[in-house]
Regions:
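Amphipathic alpha-helical dimerization/coiled-coil segments
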Residues: 86-133, 137
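Amphipathic alpha-helical coiled-coil segments
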Residues: 162-175
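Acidic interhelical loop/turn segments
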Residues: 136-155
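Extended, low-aromatic, Leu/Ala- and acidic/polar-enriched alpha-helical coiled-coil segments
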Residues: 155-163
Length: 204
């Protein structure tokens, strides 16, 4: 078995080729754009380079078209399936990462003013609702494809996170609009009270 060190993009490529069969690097890019990329974007350069690396290690098999554009097609090998299966069985011990530019700006928002925070919150709430609309469209589009149920679970998680994030930014906007200063003692209390109210409503 190959001892090649594999990372997330490696398993992404192995997983996609296992699901859809022979794939060109462009096929991989399009697959990511329409699915996984909604919750984990991968650089296109990696998606174009990784298949060749995996093929050299015997985890993918490369075939080239004889005519035309002579595109390279990659198919997962038995060794590739074995490595993919081992990875799928490994426990996930790393915590969920959230890299959100809006949250980063919010952290430093005491250096700005209330108007800027209100604007940031409004923009972020709208962005998360736009993402929610995309997820809704995916769920509707594939509603009659029961064989895709496990893939759509990731979309369901995305919907829940987008809904929660939009609600959070709504609360920030409301609290900021009612406050005169980011240093106001009522600032945090107002937002936590909104959270408590939301939790009580969900429990009832």
């Amino acid at each position: 078995m190959s001892s090649l060190r594999l990372g997330p993009v490696s398993y992404l490529v192995l997983g996609i080729t296992a699901l859809r069969g022979p794939s060109t690097p462009y096929d991989l890019k399009r697959f990511v754009q329409l699915s996984i990329g909604h919750f984990w974007p991968f650089p296109h350069t990696q998606l174009y380079a990784e298949p060749e690396r995996l093929a050299e290690a015997g985890l993918l098999e490369e075939t080239r078209e004889e005519g035309g554009r002579r595109r390279r097609h990659y198919t997962i090998t038995d060794a590739g399936r074995e490595r993919l299966g081992e990875w799928l069985e490994e426990p996930v011990t790393s915590p969920t990462e959230i890299r959100d530019l809006g949250v980063l700006k919010l952290f430093f928002s005491e250096l700005t003013g209330i108007d800027e925070i209100v604007a940031l919150a409004h923009e972020q709430a709208a962005a998360h609702r736009a993402k929610l609309a995309v997820y809704d469209g995916l769920m509707e589009r594939f509603a009659d494809r029961p064989e895709l149920a496990t893939r759509l679970l990731s979309v369901e998680l995305g919907m829940r996170l987008a809904h929660a994030a939009a609600g959070f930014w709504d609360d920030v906007q409301s609290a900021a609009s009612a406050s005169e200063s980011t240093a106001s003692g009522d600032w945090l209390a107002s937002i936590t009270a909104m959270r408590s109210g939301s939790e009580a409503a969900s429990a009832s």
